[in-house]
């Protein structure tokens, strides 16, 4: 029997012994392992000068490799070549023969570009770049993101790398659209912080992509399920997200204020941290929601499923969401969700059900109407596609071969 080929995952998003950040990539790695077709190796970046070679988490060895980048994403792409060589060197140092590698799967632009260094050692390696965001060219972030020389450099650097990638993996059709049509503005997405940057690049030619596919972020249903679900007493609404402008917590709070004005009884738990948190607390106070809305900074990962199970409804009106694992995690625990139109999760909603579960962007009135409708009528939420990560990964690996 032939030895298994190696599947290398290169990602900035991965848990450590101290943090579960990036657990969705961890879940995907475990699903590939359970599938059994490949031997999986994980590479995570470290700062240059860091002497660590790796760490172990839940019996999985994670290799570290030095990566170079300028602060605040300045001229992102300038060091793609340096990092590609650094990764290739780390792979060989880890005792992995490039001839045994079948797939190099980078998560986000810089890591897809780094994976190209392995293809230079073995041209038979299939290089994948997975896009987790509605900004697949990574032009939105950084203090000087809107400065045209920086913006243009970053976009062109990403395009050069992307045209060498064998397969672009997108977590939703919305992400795939933004990737394929860049720099065209997506008419379904109303987020000016991103759209104005696209307009600055309107003269740039489209990227000649070799191939794209959609792989939805799956759920580990051994953890996220309805076992032990309990909902009783006051109607409970929940939300988990970083407090950023794109998550639209203020729209959610205004919707809750309208529900209170209509005499509806409910309580809400909003979990997360971020720059918008204090402003949201102040808005909650102004709306006289102090007795109904609770803000929690953190929730240990091991308690996440229990949080979902005690909710009646999960609501996150984000207006720039590539997918949103929290929606399908909640659903797997028996809790339906309300999101916004035009986001990645909209793929999972049947078109005829959109009026139940997808609110207009930035619209507290529409959001409050949809929450009220669920409180009063409790319609069943159906999803168009599987959420189980083993099912999704098996189908993906079938296509990959």
Task: List PLM regions with ranges.
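N-terminal subdomain of nucleotide-sugar transferases
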Residues: 1-58
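Conserved donor-binding/catalytic core segment of Leloir-type glycosyltransferases
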Residues: 8, 169, 214, 230-247, ...
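A short, active-site helix/loop in glycosyltransferases that binds the activated sugar's phosphate group
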Residues: 48, 155-211
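An aromatic- and histidine-rich active-site surface loop
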Residues: 50, 80, 84, 103-123, ...
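Short alpha-helical donor nucleotide-sugar binding micro-motif in glycosyltransferases
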Residues: 298-299, 306-311
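Aromatic "clamp/platform" in nucleotide-sugar-dependent glycosyltransferases that forms part
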Residues: 319
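Conserved acidic donor-binding segment of nucleotide-sugar-dependent glycosyltransferases
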Residues: 351-352, 356-364, 372-376
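A charged, aromatic-enriched C-terminal amphipathic alpha-helix characteristic of glycosyltransferases
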Residues: 376-401
């Amino acid at each position: 029997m032939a030895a298994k080929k190696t599947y290398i995952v290169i990602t900035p998003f991965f848990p450590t012994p101290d943090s579960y950040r990036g657990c969705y990539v961890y879940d995907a790695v475990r699903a590939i392992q359970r599938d059994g077709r490949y031997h999986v190796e994980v590479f995570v970046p470290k700062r240059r000068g860091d002497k660590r070679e790796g760490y172990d988490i839940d019996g999985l060895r994670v290799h570290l490799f030095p990566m170079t980048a300028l602060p605040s994403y300045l001229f992102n792409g300038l060091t793609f070549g340096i990092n590609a060589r650094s990764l290739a060197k780390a792979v060989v140092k880890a005792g992995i023969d490039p001839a045994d590698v079948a797939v190099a799967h980078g998560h986000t632009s810089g890591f897809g570009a780094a994976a190209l260094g392995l293809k230079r050692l073995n041209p038979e390696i299939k290089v994948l770049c997975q896009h987790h965001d509605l900004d697949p060219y990574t032009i939105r972030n950084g203090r000087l993101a809107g400065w045209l020389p920086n913006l243009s450099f970053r976009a062109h650097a990403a395009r050069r790398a992307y045209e060498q990638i064998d397969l672009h993996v997108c977590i939703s059709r919305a992400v795939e659209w933004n990737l394929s049509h860049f720099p065209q503005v997506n008419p379904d997405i109303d987020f000016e912080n991103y759209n104005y940057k696209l307009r600055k690049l309107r003269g740039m030619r489209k990227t000649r992509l070799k191939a794209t596919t959609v792989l939805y972020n799956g759920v580990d249903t051994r953890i996220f399920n309805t076992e032990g679900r309990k909902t009783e007493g006051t109607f409970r609404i929940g939300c988990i997200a970083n407090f950023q402008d794109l998550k639209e917590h203020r729209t959610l709070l205004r919707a809750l204020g309208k529900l209170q004005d209509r005499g509806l009884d409910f309580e809400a738990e909003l979990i997360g941290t971020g720059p918008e948190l204090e402003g949201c607390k102040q808005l909650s106070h102004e709306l006289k929601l102090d007795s109904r809305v609770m803000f929690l900074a953190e929730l240990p990962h091991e308690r996440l499923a229990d949080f979902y199970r005690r909710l009646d409804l999960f609501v996150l009106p984000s207006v720039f969401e590539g997918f949103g694992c929290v929606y399908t995690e909640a659903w797997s625990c028996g809790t339906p969700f309300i999101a916004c139109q035009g986001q990645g999760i909209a793929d999972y909603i049947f078109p005829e059900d959109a009026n139940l579960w997808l609110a207009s962007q930035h619209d507290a009135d529409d959001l409050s109407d949809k929450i009220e409708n669920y409180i009063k009528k409790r319609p069943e939420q159906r999803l168009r596609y599987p959420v189980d990560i083993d099912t999704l990964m098996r189908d993906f690996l079938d296509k990959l071969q």
